[in-house]
Regions:
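C-terminal scaffold of the Radical SAM
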Residues: 1-191
Length: 191
C-alpha cells in the first residue's frame, strides 16, 4: 500500500495541477479491511470533487508473499463479503457515470476523450517499448523482459547492448489469445 494521508494526496494533486498537468489519473482500491459502503462512497465522492480526468478503481486482491497475505491466512484481516464488494462496484458505476465519467474498461473511467492511451495500447495488442529495470516491451509480435536489478541491467547493457533476460516470439495463437483476453477487459469488447 501507499504510505500517505489524504491531505498529502490532495496537496500533491493540487501541486500537479499548479505545475500544469491537465490530464491526471487517480487509482483507488475498494474492499479494504473493515471498509463499509458508506466509507467507500465518501472516498469516491471526495475524489470526484477533485475532477481528475481519469479514475481507476480496483477491488483489493490479496497477493501471495505479501504482509496482507500473511494477515489474511492468520485470520487477522476483516475483508468485506463478496456481496458488499459488488455493492461497492455498483456504487462506483452509479457515482462516476452520474458525475460525467464513462466506463471504457472494467476498472477504468474517464471524461470524454481522456481514456488512458497507455492502457489501450496493452488491451489492443499494440507495440510498446519500455525502458529500465524490470521493464517489459512488446514489438513486432515479440515480448521482451529486462533485468530486474540495476546491477544486472548495467552488466547486460555493457556486454550486449540490451538488458533482455527473456525474449519470447508470440505465435499467432498467442496473439489471438492475448487479444481476446485483454479485449475482454474493455467495455467495447473485441472487434
Amino acid at each position: 500500500g501507499r504510505i500517505h494521508s489524504y491531505s498529502q494526496f490532495v496537496e500533491n494533486y493540487n501541486l500537479a495541477r499548479k505545475l500544469g498537468f491537465n490530464n491526471i489519473n487517480i487509482d483507488l482500491i475498494f474492499g479494504l479491511p473493515d471498509e463499509n459502503l458508506e466509507e467507500w462512497t465518501e472516498d469516491l465522492k471526495r475524489v470526484i470533487e477533485l475532477r481528475p480526468e481519469h479514475i481507476s478503481t480496483y477491488s483489493l486482491i490479496i497477493e501471495e508473499d505479501t504482509p496482507f497475505f500473511k494477515l489474511y491466512n492468520d485470520g487477522r484481516l476483516n475483508l468485506p463479503e463478496e456481496e458488499l464488494e459488488r455493492d461497492m462496484y455498483r456504487r462506483t458505476l452509479d457515482l462516476l457515470i452520474k458525475a460525467g465519467y464513462h466506463q471504457y474498461e472494467i476498472s477504468n473511467f474517464s471524461l470524454e476523450g481522456k481514456e488512458c492511451r497507455h492502457n489501450l495500447v496493452y488491451w489492443n495488442l499494440e507495440d510498446y517499448i519500455a525502458c529500465g529495470t524490470g521493464a517489459h516491451s512488446y514489438s513486432g509480435g515479440v515480448r521482451y523482459k529486462n533485468a530486474h536489478t540495476i546491477e544486472e541491467y548495467l552488466e547486460l547493457m555493457k556486454a550486449k547492448g540490451n538488458a533482455f533476460v527473456s525474449v519470447h516470439e508470440n505465435s499467432q495463437k498467442d496473439d489471438i489469445e492475448e487479444f481476446i483476453f485483454m479485449g475482454m477487459r474493455k467495455i467495447d469488447g473485441i472487434s
